[in-house]
């Protein structure tokens, strides 16, 4: 099997719009959570989010394609531009090349575009009033459709949509295709819009934090006893995933090698995880790993049930060894749903490169059931070699990715 490495990254997130801004926020444990007037006006109970702050984002986007793009596509476009520059790829290396592809997904497409379309019909009573661009904007494959066109990609071109595991699946699938020799390079990741139209559904099911509306930066509190739900976020992330020899042939900078990918299904409950699927997933990812995991960026989102189920699964997986250092970057960033897997992989890559571990913040009283789980609550400087990142989603879908420092 061919070896697979990561040579470039780009990100738009609640804690920064490029890798330097994101690195600074991580090192300072600077929260990206803020008050949302939009959510308050909509009548939601939760008034906090991990907002995306962008200026002049339409700049240099072909208008013929821009009209088809939703917010997630725009975030992903900006991330892909960064990733291409970061990987030092010339247009000749990726344009019109059948060995270069895109696998970029979204968990929801664009509820904002869908609701806008329906609202126009209700208001005008005319189907023809709906924008002809609504279909493309609303598709969960909108990102890959738009980016493959803008960047002239001729290799694989599709999206995976698997709730909050979406972009992690995209990375894992990219790894497999390259291992099998079907592609040399794949742009992999995902994006998610941030809007009341998307957030309201989670608010209605009681999944979002509501207790800390007046203190937004305290609202995402993974493993804290008083956690009361997750904080919704958005953005995008793109990785340049390459076959090792292909990367070496062009003297590419290598962030890390992807050495493990596990995926599984709970087959248990649509919204409540079983824990068994997560255990199988982590074990599959580690099946060819000999060295210990130095750090695990958990999926845990700040929900009463989900956080403890993941911790129990981790305890079972590592019961014969020692539990790796654990933390959740979502305590700083919020939960960007389909974009979370790739964003958290980027946070992990930066930690691996610069040898530090971001703590879980806002743990004022650790949940008693989370004791003795090696949860990090203060910034740590540590030489790192191997990192695991978990991403789980509704429907019992699970992904574990493992990266190793390339020496």
UniProtKB/Swiss-Prot annotation:
- Which superkingdom, per the lineage? Bacteria
GO terms of biological process kind = fatty acid biosynthetic process
Question: In which pathway does this enzyme or protein participate?
Answer: Lipid metabolism; fatty acid biosynthesis
Identify the EC number(s). 2.3.1.41
Q: Where is the signal peptide?
A: none
Q: What class of enzyme is it?
A: transferase
Q: Which GO terms describe its cellular component?
A: cytosol
Q: Spell out the subcellular localization from the entry.
A: Cytoplasm
Listed under catalytic activity are: a fatty acyl-[ACP] + malonyl-[ACP] + H(+) = a 3-oxoacyl-[ACP] + holo-[ACP] + CO2; (3Z)-decenoyl-[ACP] + malonyl-[ACP] + H(+) = 3-oxo-(5Z)-dodecenoyl-[ACP] + holo-[ACP] + CO2
Q: Could you tell me which SUPFAM superfamilies the record lists for this protein?
A: Thiolase-like (SSF53901)
Q: Which CDD domains match?
A: KAS_I_II
Domain Ketosynthase family 3 (KS3) intervals? 1-405
Q: Which Gene3D superfamilies match?
A: 3.40.47.10
- Which GO MF terms are attached to this record? 3-oxoacyl-[acyl-carrier-protein] synthase activity
The family note in this entry says: Belongs to the thiolase-like superfamily. Beta-ketoacyl-ACP synthases family.
Q: How does it assemble?
A: Homodimer.
Q: What does this protein do?
A: Involved in the type II fatty acid elongation cycle. Catalyzes the elongation of a wide range of acyl-ACP by the addition of two carbons from malonyl-ACP to an acyl acceptor. Can also use unsaturated fatty acids. Catalyzes a key reaction in unsaturated fatty acid (UFA) synthesis, the elongation of the cis-3-decenoyl-ACP produced by FabA.
What is the protein's name according to its record? 3-oxoacyl-[acyl-carrier-protein] synthase 1
The source organism is Buchnera aphidicola subsp. Baizongia pistaciae (strain Bp)
Q: Which gene encodes it?
A: fabB
């Amino acid at each position: 099997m061919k070896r697979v490495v990561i040579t470039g990254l780009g990100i738009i997130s609640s804690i920064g719009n490029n890798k330097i801004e994101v690195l600074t926020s991580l090192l300072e444990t600077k929260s990206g959570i803020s008050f949302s007037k939009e959510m308050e006006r909509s009548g939601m109970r939760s008034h906090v989010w991990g907002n995306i702050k962008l200026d002049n984002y339409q700049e240099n986007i072909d208008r013929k394609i821009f009209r088809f793009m939703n917010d997630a596509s725009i975030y992903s476009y900006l991330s892909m531009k960064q990733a291409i520059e970061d990987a030092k790829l010339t247009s000749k290396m990726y344009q019109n090349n059948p060995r270069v592809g895109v696998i970029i997904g979204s968990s929801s497409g664009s509820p904002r575009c869908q609701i806008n379309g329906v609202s126009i019909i209700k208001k005008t009573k005319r189907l023809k009033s709906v924008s002809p661009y609504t279909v493309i904007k609303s598709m969960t494959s909108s990102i890959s459709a738009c980016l493959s066109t803008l960047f002239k990609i001729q290799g694989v071109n599709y999206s995976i949509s698997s709730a909050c595991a979406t972009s992690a699946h995209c990375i894992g699938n990219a790894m497999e295709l390259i291992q099998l020799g079907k592609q040399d390079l794949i742009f992999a990741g995902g994006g998610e819009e941030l809007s009341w139209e998307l957030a309201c559904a989670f608010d209605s099911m009681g999944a979002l934090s509501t207790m800390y509306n007046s203190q937004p930066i305290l609202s995402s509190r993974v493993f804290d006893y008083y956690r009361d739900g997750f904080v919704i976020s958005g953005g995008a992330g793109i990785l340049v995933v390459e076959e090792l020899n292909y990367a070496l042939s062009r003297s590419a900078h290598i962030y890390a090698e992807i050495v493990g990918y596990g995926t599984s299904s709970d087959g248990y409950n649509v919204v409540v995880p079983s824990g068994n699927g997560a255990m199988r997933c982590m074990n599959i990812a580690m099946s060819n790993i000999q060295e210990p995991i130095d750090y695990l960026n958990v999926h845990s989102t700040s929900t009463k049930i989900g956080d403890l189920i993941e911790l129990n699964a981790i305890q079972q997986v590592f019961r014969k060894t020692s539990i790796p250092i654990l933390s959740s970057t979502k305590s700083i960033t919020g939960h960007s749903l389909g974009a979370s897997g790739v964003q958290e992989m980027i946070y992990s890559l930066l930690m691996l490169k610069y040898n530090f571990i971001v703590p879980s913040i806002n743990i004022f009283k650790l949940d008693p059931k989370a004791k003795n789980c090696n949860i990090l609550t203060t910034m740590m400087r540590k030489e790192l070699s191997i990192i695991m990142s978990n991403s789980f989603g509704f429907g019992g879908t699970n992904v574990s990715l493992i990266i190793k420092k390339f020496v």
